[in-house]
Amino acid sequence: MNQKLVPVNTAGCYIPGGRYAHIASAVMSVTTAKVAGVKNIIACSPPKEGVGAHPTIVYTADLCGADVILNLGGVPAIAAMTNGLFNNPPADIIVGPGNQFVAEAKRILFGKVGIDLFAGPTEIGIIADAKADPEIVAVDLLSLIHI
């Protein structure tokens, strides 16, 4: 038995950026596509009122190797990447977390385009007693913070 890994031509990386800049999502999705040998990497992140896409998301996506960064969020972003809008090739796969609308768009389009999973909001809980090292507890709390 063996396995053959064949990179897709185009990956669409959705990077949430509404309330918080999800820099980790940019790193995890764009870097993975780059390392896998994907030829075209399209990143989408929603605009913040008056400033466009969050500057740290744009910087991070560019640093990680995104070929195109669209200032577009939510369902329109998923549709744009799936259908190859704005003179971009259509995505073979859409990856990245999002709100319930992004998850539903990915569910509806599954089959036309590959998806990673139906990602929901990140939740974390820390259980510590009086003997816990406060520094370690603080690092645990900061582990999934999105600024």
Feature locations, PLM:
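Conserved NAD(P)+-binding/catalytic subdomain of aldehyde/semialdehyde dehydrogenases
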Residues: 63-140
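Conserved small-residue-rich beta-alpha loop and adjacent elements
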Residues: 1-59
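Conserved small/polar residues in nucleotide/adenosyl-binding loops
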Residues: 145-147
